[in-house]
């Protein structure tokens, strides 16, 4: 009986180990040298004070499956795990003032190659590009053998990624500027399929003054939906269906107007959408919830911020949604994002950043349904 019990315990430990080991989004670097590290379930993330990066908006972080830092970037500079700029990693063509300036996609066929996608600010001519990081170089600290490879130009400040339905490859999604066109690129073990983009004409026109390019793009945790915030003149949130097999975007639903719509994030169960807006010129920071099970979205104002501006939303590994508060030493937190209405419990000063400050952005990650 004792031997049987021991075998059962060992089997349970072996089954649990892979799930526990997959922690690629446990480290966040963002804002004014701010950071967070997420621990076991039920614990509060702890602030990090070792970042060398300042970014007004976007950032991205690469970690091992165990949550060990590899590198981070604001779309212009890449810092290695020793918090030093990588060789050839200081002139990427993103921008710390682009909503989603950077996104890191691991090569599906290699544990050593990573692709850093960048988007220019305000529909600028640098467009959507990618750079290649090889972690076998520089004595394991990483280097960039190729940088700033152009995919398409111009684009909005929107950049998101989700795992393919095959469970291996990754779709990278952006939006053309002066267009209704989403553009999707597949990343496989053979690399970025740059010559074979998937085009989807759906939803609102992304055009006008450069500031209209502002606003985030985010996939739902189950990968079936994608949401966008359209800033200023457009002033709305949109939700679309996404096909993880074909890379196609379809069936737009619009909610608005919400002046200066900026950030979007889905609840862990993918049924509720959250969006931030600040009012024309800022000063009226609001957090809205939309129930995607209803026809009109049942829009509910679930929180206001004492901060003049709030920005990006990001679902954490702990199942809570974090809210960037511009120039503030604390993030807002949606404590129960699966709960409809104000039961979701928004806390404006939800977590302190250890003396560092948030800007408008939070790190961008590949969604892994």
Where are the regions a protein language model picked out?
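Bacterial Sec-dependent N-terminal signal peptides
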Residues: 1-25, 260-262
């Amino acid at each position: 009986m004792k031997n049987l019990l021991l075998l059962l315990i060992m089997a349970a430990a072996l089954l649990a180990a892979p799930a526990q080991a997959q922690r690629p989004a446990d480290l966040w670097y963002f804002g004014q040298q701010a950071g967070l590290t997420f621990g076991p379930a039920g614990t509060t993330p702890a602030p990090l004070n070792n970042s060398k990066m300042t970014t007004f908006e976007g950032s991205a972080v690469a970690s091992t499956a165990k949550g060990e830092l590899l590198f981070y970037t604001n779309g212009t500079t890449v810092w290695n795990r020793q918090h030093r700029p990588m060789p050839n990693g200081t002139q990427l063509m993103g921008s710390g003032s682009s909503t989603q300036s950077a996104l890191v996609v691991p090569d599906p066929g290699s544990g050593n190659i990573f692709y850093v996608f960048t988007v220019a600010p305000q529909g600028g001519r640098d467009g959507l590009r990618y750079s290649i990081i090889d972690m076998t170089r520089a004595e394991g600290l990483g280097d960039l053998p190729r940088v700033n490879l152009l995919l398409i130009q111009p684009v909005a400040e929107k950049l998101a990624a989700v795992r393919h339905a095959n469970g291996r490859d990754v779709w990278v999604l952006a939006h053309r500027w002066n267009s209704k066109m989403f553009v999707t690129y597949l990343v496989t073990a053979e690399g970025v399929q740059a010559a074979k983009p998937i085009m989807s004409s759906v939803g609102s026109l992304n055009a006008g003054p450069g500031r209209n390019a502002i606003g985030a793009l985010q996939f739902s945790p189950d990968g079936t939906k994608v949401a966008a915030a359209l800033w200023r003149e457009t002033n709305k949130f949109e939700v679309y269906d996404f096909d993880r097999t074909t890379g196609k975007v379809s069936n737009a639903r619009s909610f608005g107007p919400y002046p200066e719509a900026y950030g979007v994030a889905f609840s862990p169960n993918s049924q509720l959408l959250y969006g931030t807006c600040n009012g024309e010129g800022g000063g009226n920071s609001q957090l809205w919830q939309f129930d995607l099970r209803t026809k009109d979205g049942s829009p509910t104002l679930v929180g206001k911020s004492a901060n003049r501006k709030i920005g990006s939303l990001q679902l954490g590994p702990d199942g809570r949604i974090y809210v960037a508060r511009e120039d503030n030493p604390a993030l807002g937190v949606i404590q129960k994002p699966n709960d409809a209405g104000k039961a979701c419990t928004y806390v404006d000063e939800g977590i302190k950043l250890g003396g560092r400050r948030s800007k408008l952005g939070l790190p961008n990650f590949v969604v892994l349904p």
